[in-house]
Amino acid sequence: MTEFIPPGTRFHALPSPFPFKRGGALHGARVAYETWGTLAADASNAILIVTGLSPDAHAAANDANPAAGWWEGMVGPGKAIDTDRWFVVCVNSLGSCKGSTGPASLNPATGQPYRLDFPELSIEDGARAAIEVVRALGIEQLACVVGNSMGGMTALAVLMLHPGIARSHVNISGSAQALPFSIAIRSLQREAIRLDPRWNGGHYDDDAYPESGMRMARKLGVITYRSALEWDGRFGRVRLDSDQTDDDPFGLEFQVESYLEGHARRFVRFFDPNCYLYLSRSMDWFDLAEYADGDVLAGLAKIRVEKALAIGANTDILFPVQQQQQVADGLRAGGADAHFIGLESPQGHDAFLVDFDRFGPAVRGFLDAL
């Protein structure tokens, strides 16, 4: 079992024990993070970024690691999240394999990876861990907490669990609860991993690794991260050249199939399967309605921020834009100056990672007005 930690990653030790929402606790756990910009003397210019399922804390290039980050087009000097003005902190989610303690990490009690002995992970656990980093940096109140995809859930949990922790919020392609379609897709992804004989109840290693299950899980994910409009525009029904196919009568024939296969193969050895299972399930469990007798809008209305922006792509099938509209409506009911923007992007759920021409101005306009 392997962790994948970028150069320049910083670490914060969590309190020991660190209890989990659903029971159990970690001892000697840590959270991975990176920072950009300069914290103001009064610590009033801090922005927290909480991520989706797979990213590490390296959102953009910095002095510690000049390699491009996963949100390079959004974070940096003069960009939408302008590090000339803002002190930006990006936290890798608890439960990940990218630096924060997760199922692939060594259990100090045994000297072996936690595997399935890791406590049941909730979005709220990741939110509490992120705020431990914020407090350690001397920040009492954030100017803004920004979350995308799963990070949109984590950001809402941060705001719910820590009233007054942030003056504003940007929710990008996120939600206040998981929809049945998303739960169904993620359940199939987890099943694909667990049905791979090499998963072996979570006891795999680099030599006996559930690559087939991970590859199928990733393919299912990529299909939901994009849109039919993008598939049509990029691939249509174009077939592979004869020298790109093999003799398997049911093998790869169309370019879109080849794309999925290549994308999945690039991913499977760079993310731990057990971490994938834990983080995926934490998204299914998250529901702000739990905080308001089953009413998600009432749950959102309990959050207190001055301003909020919820944005998404109209082609997103995994976190559809009505969920971002719901976030804006609920926060507005709680007294926030909250707005929703649905963007006409062809790139589906992953649009926030690539469509900076649309997402960038929306985020920049909101932050510039703070």
Curated annotation (Swiss-Prot):
Important for substrate specificity: annotated segments: 52-55
Q: Which GO terms describe its cellular component?
A: cytoplasm
Which residue intervals define the domain AB hydrolase-1 in the entry?
Answer: 46-355
**E.C. number, please?**
2.3.1.-
Annotated positions binding substrate: R218, D350
Catalytic residues? S149, D316, H349
Positions of the site: Important for acyl-CoA specificity?
R186
The protein's GO terms of the molecular function aspect are: homoserine O-acetyltransferase activity; L-serine O-succinyltransferase activity
Compartments, record wording: Cytoplasm
Entry keyword Hydrolase: no
User: What reaction does this enzyme carry out catalytically?
Assistant: succinyl-CoA + L-serine = O-succinyl-L-serine + CoA
Keywords attached to this entry: Acyltransferase, Amino-acid biosynthesis, Cysteine biosynthesis, Cytoplasm, Transferase
Subcellular location, principal: cytoplasm
Xref: Pfam families: Abhydrolase_1 (PF00561)
Per the record, the pathway is: Amino-acid biosynthesis; L-cysteine biosynthesis; L-cysteine from L-serine: step 1/2
Query: GO biological process: any one?
Result: cysteine biosynthetic process from serine
Assembly mode = Homodimer.
> What does this protein do, in the record's words?
Transfers a succinyl group from succinyl-CoA to L-serine, forming succinyl-L-serine.
User: What family does the entry list?
Assistant: Belongs to the AB hydrolase superfamily. MetX family.
User: What protein name does the entry list?
Assistant: Serine O-succinyltransferase
* Protein encoded by which gene: metX
